[in-house]
């Protein structure tokens, strides 16, 4: 029995378990061609040695004349019938004649078998070994080429990563320098503002202003340098990312080639490489990608913080400007309202003075003029009462047709001509319209003043239109319920307040005053009345011009207020735009993080594939 029994007792062992070539047979699936040749040659030698040993043992244990015993190769005794002397003699003659024994025949058979096996099996195995070596050589060359390319890509990625690290450090230092320059500029600005508040001499102010300008220039240069270095760092980081991705692709090709070679050639010793004490291949690429991820993450965080700080500062400045513009807008609106109230009060005062002058002039003429003056005084008092009780001025309604039919068309025509002339000269349309409206109102007022001094012949048409418009509107007003109510109100007011008695007493007093100053003739009274009328006309024109000028001033103030309101809206839009930019920066940061997560996932997949390949090789690596 063989002594090579492994795993179990001899009673439970089968023939395969006790066979001396069991271990060699189990390794046939993982051997190279040369190993196959060695295994088969060893099996042949073991077989021939075993057969020769059995033949020698049989030959030594039995005499030569015992043919039956020589035909058996085991240790069992051979039983046979007794033989005669004649048979013994014949057998001896046969041996003497040179007959071959069983051991000799077995040796001859084994020699022929060995010759046949050596001639066929070894030649076939040698051919297969040559084919295997050629295929293995091609696979090794392919793997070597891929490995060289992968190593070059890894080295380039590592160099690019180092360059990106240096660029990031330079950008960080430049950002710190820019921050320091901003602090210096703020300090210079504060010193200059303090000097302005303290009222220092002009020489010191000029020196501080020059220092402030220099600090601002240095801060601007520092920011420009920081932006340039930041852009350079971002470019180098992108280049490093691209090279790392390329190295990852070469690594994937190497993994595919190794897996294909493992499936095709098995875990051959010729495909195995000795372990290296330093990081190589996927491990080195993983280290490079990890460092690259750290750089990208750090750069993204710093970029987001920088943008957030910049946007916050810009937003704070715009909010301060917005508050300032809002305060200025409120101030301009308040000034316009005060100006409008002031001009209204002035107009009322001048109107009452004109009414008084007209009433005084009527005293020298008497008769119908005095009655008209009383009517004018009553209308003025009634207009104030109506404005106080109802909030509506019927005198404004009476003058509205005059404005609509005469003054407004005239102002619009003059304003249109001035606007077209300004636009033809290259002035902006909006500014030309504003200037045309202001100049149109001024020219119209000047034209009315000139017409008043030129004479009645020049304003006859205008006066007729005014009289017709006022008469028609007055007739409609008197026929309406408002007019009737106004008449009743004036009558009651005159009765209660003694306005009629006041009128008669005033006429008597004026007659006495006329006599006292020596105006007895009618011509003298008419002369004084004409002078009073001229003075009233001049004052009325002056009132209208002052009201127009006041309206222009109020319009200018309102235009300034509208400009401030436009600035406020622009500042609000800038604040909204800054918020949108900050939102885009956050989205870009999230996108970069997603890209990094995908890159790390690919690295993890590559490591998992490499681990699976190593496990496959270890499972197929068996001892021969």
Curated annotation (Swiss-Prot):
Lineage top rank: taxon: Bacteria
Gene3D superfamilies: Nucleotidyltransferases domain 2 (1.20.120.330)
Subcellular location: Secreted; Host membrane
Transmembrane residue ranges: 359-379, 405-425, 434-454
InterPro entries per record: BipB-like_C (IPR006972), IpaB/BipB/SctE_N (IPR032391), T3SS_SctE/BipB (IPR003895)
Compositionally biased region (Basic and acidic residues): 66-88
Coiled-coil segments: 313-343
Region (Disordered): 54-99
Sorted UniProt keywords: Coiled coil, Host membrane, Membrane, Secreted, Transmembrane, Transmembrane helix, Virulence
Cellular component per GO, a single term: membrane
Keyword Secreted annotated: yes
Stated role: Plays a role in the bacterium-induced formation of multinucleated giant cell (MNGC), which is formed after host cell fusion, as well as in the intercellular spreading of bacteria and in the induction of apoptosis in macrophages. May act in concert with other effector proteins to induce fusion of host cell membranes.
Family of the protein in this entry: Belongs to the SctE/SipB/YopB family.
Protein name, entry field: Translocator protein BipB
Native species: Burkholderia thailandensis (strain ATCC 700388 / DSM 13276 / CCUG 48851 / CIP 106301 / E264)
Gene: bipB
């Amino acid at each position: 029995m063989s002594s090579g029994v492994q795993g179990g007792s001899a009673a439970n062992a089968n023939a395969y378990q006790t066979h001396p070539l069991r271990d060699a047979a189990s390794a046939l699936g993982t051997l190279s061609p040369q190993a196959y040749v060695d295994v088969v040659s060893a099996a042949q030698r073991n077989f021939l040695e075993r057969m020769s040993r059995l033949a020698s043992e049989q030959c030594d244990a039995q005499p030569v004349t015992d043919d039956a015993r020589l035909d058996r190769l085991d240790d069992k005794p051979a039983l046979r019938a007794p033989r005669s002397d004649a048979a013994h003699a014949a057998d001896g003659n046969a041996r003497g004649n040179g007959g071959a024994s069983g051991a000799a025949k077995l040796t001859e058979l084994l020699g022929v078998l060995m010759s046949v096996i050596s001639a066929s099996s070894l030649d076939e195995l040698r051919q297969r070994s040559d084919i295997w070596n050629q295929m293995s050589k091609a696979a090794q060359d392919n793997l070597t080429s891929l490995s060289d390319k992968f190593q070059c890509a890894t080295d380039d990625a590592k160099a690019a990563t180092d360059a990106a690290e240096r660029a990031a450090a330079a950008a960080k230092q430049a950002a710190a320098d820019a921050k320091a320059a901003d602090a210096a500029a703020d300090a210079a600005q504060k010193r200059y503002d303090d000097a302005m508040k303290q009222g220092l001499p002009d020489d010191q102010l000029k020196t501080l202003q020059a220092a402030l300008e220099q600090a601002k220039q240095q801060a601007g240069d520092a920011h420009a340098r920081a932006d340039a270095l930041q852009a350079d760092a971002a470019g180098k980081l992108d280049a490093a990312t691209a090279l790392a991705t390329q190295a990852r692709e070469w690594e994937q090709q190497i993994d595919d080639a190794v897996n294909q070679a493992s499936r095709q050639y098995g875990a051959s010793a010729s495909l195995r490489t000795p372990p290296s004490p330093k990081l190589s291949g996927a491990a080195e690429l993983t280290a490079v990608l990890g460092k690259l991820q750290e750089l990208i993450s750090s750069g993204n965080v710093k970029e987001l913080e920088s943008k957030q700080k910049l946007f916050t500062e810009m937003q704070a400045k715009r909010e301060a400007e917005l508050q300032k513009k809002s305060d200025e807008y409120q101030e301009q609106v308040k000034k316009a309202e005060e100006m409008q109230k002031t001009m209204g009060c002035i107009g009322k005062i001048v109107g009452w003075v004109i009414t008084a002058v007209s009433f005084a002039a009527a005293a020298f003429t008497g008769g119908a003029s005095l009655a008209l003056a009383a009517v004018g005084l009553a209308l003025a008092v009634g207009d104030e009462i109506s404005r106080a009780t109802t909030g509506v001025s019927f005198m404004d309604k009476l003058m509205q047709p005059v404005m609509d039919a005469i003054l407004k068309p005239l102002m619009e025509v003059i304003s249109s001509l001035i606007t077209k002339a300004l636009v033809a000269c290259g002035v902006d349309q909006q500014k030309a319209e504003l200037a045309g409206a202001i100049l149109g109102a001024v020219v119209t007022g000047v034209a009315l003043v000139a017409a008043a001094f030129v004479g009645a012949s020049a304003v006859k048409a205008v006066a007729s239109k005014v009289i017709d418009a006022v008469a028609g509107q007055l007739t409609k007003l008197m026929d309406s319920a408002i007019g009737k109510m106004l008449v009743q109100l004036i009558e009651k007011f005159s009765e209660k307040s003694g306005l009629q008695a006041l009128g008669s007493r005033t006429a008597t007093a004026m007659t006495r005053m006329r006599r006292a100053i020596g105006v007895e003739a009618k011509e003298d009274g008419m002369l004084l009345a004409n002078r009073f009328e001229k003075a009233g006309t001049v004052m009325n024109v002056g009132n209208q011009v002052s009201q127009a000028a006041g309206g222009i001033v109020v319009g200018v103030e309102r235009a300034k207020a509208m400009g401030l309101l436009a600035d406020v809206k622009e500042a609000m839009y800038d604040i909204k735009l800054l918020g949108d930019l900050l939102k885009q920066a956050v989205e870009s940061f999230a996108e970069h993080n997603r890209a990094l997560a995908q890159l790390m996932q690919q690295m993890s997949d590559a490591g998992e594939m490499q681990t699976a390949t190593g496990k496959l090789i270890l499972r197929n690596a068996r001892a021969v």
